[in-house]
């Protein structure tokens, strides 16, 4: 990983569960709830479109804790099974499939599908990761297609491809903004061709060019870096912005992000089940 509301009460992205309000946020919020009817199947060719202000949970560390009472889960596509996705659907949740698109990871089951020639510099701070040469669409497209196929077969509603702003990093390759646009649009098309919605992860510089290609955004730390205003094209287009802060406390960012329409919460950097929504 890279490794950030419309004021409608029914969709308050900054609403917290009883356990969040009562405690200091040290444990996963919410208790197991009675199963709700599964979401109705979308009309033919219609993708799920999350709306601004929709509450969410983001857990990439291990198997998902399915007890958190929110309508959207974003979980690791490799670490979670079709049964987990089905359980969340039975509770009325929509489920996003996380995978790393911009970097190779030495712990993934498809690691040998990446030729050595597309592996670049280490992704500093993330053990076992190396940037990939996003210019090599001929090599990466079938690998990404296979990952998105995995998400579709497991029943996910959407995908979150991570590290989609490599051109702003020291990847070991001379990547350009146009290289990044082509790669990101390839990811969006692969998802849409399979009936899945797709998130634009961070990549604030290219939001004006890509807001029409992506169905929602996932952002880390826009409040910490004073960048949340740059996400408003998604909100104006009626598309959710799922946002987290790691170092700031909710009282330091919620008033701003609620006003802008973001679905915000504080998470630990390890992205376990713990959360403190606005």
Model-derived segments and spans:
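Active-site-adjacent beta->alpha loops and helix N-cap segments on the catalytic face
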Residues: 79-90, 178-179, 226-234
């Amino acid at each position: 990983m890279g490794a950030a509301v419309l004021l409608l009460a029914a969709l308050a992205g900054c609403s917290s569960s009883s356990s969040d309000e009562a405690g200091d946020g040290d444990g996963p919020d919410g208790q197991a709830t009675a199963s709700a009817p599964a979401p109705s199947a979308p009309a033919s060719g219609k993708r799920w479109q999350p709306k601004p202000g929709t509450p969410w949970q983001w857990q990439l560390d291990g198997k998902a804790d399915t007890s958190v009472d929110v309508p959207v889960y974003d979980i690791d596509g490799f670490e979670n099974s079709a049964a987990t996705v089905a359980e969340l659907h039975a509770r009325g949740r929509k489920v996003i499939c996380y995978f790393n698109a911009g970097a190779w990871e030495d712990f993934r089951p498809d690691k040998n599908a990446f030729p050595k020639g597309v592996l670049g510099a280490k992704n500093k701070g993330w053990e076992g990761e190396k940037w990939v040469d996003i210019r090599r669409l001929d090599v990466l497209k079938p690998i990404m297609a296979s990952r998105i196929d995995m998400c579709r077969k497991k029943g996910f509603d959407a995908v979150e491809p991570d590290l989609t702003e490599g051109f702003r990093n020291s990847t070991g390759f001379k990547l350009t903004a146009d290289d990044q646009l082509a790669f990101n649009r390839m990811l969006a098309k692969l998802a849409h061709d399979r009936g899945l919605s797709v998130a634009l992860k961070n990549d604030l510089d290219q939001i004006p060019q890509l807001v029409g290609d992506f169905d929602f955004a996932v952002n880390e730390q826009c409040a910490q870096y004073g960048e949340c205003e740059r996400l408003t094209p998604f909100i104006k287009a009626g598309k959710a912005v799922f946002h987290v802060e790691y170092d700031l406390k909710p009282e330091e960012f919620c008033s701003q992000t609620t006003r802008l329409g973001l679905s915000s919460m504080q998470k630990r950097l390890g992205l376990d089940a713990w959360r403190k929504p606005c």
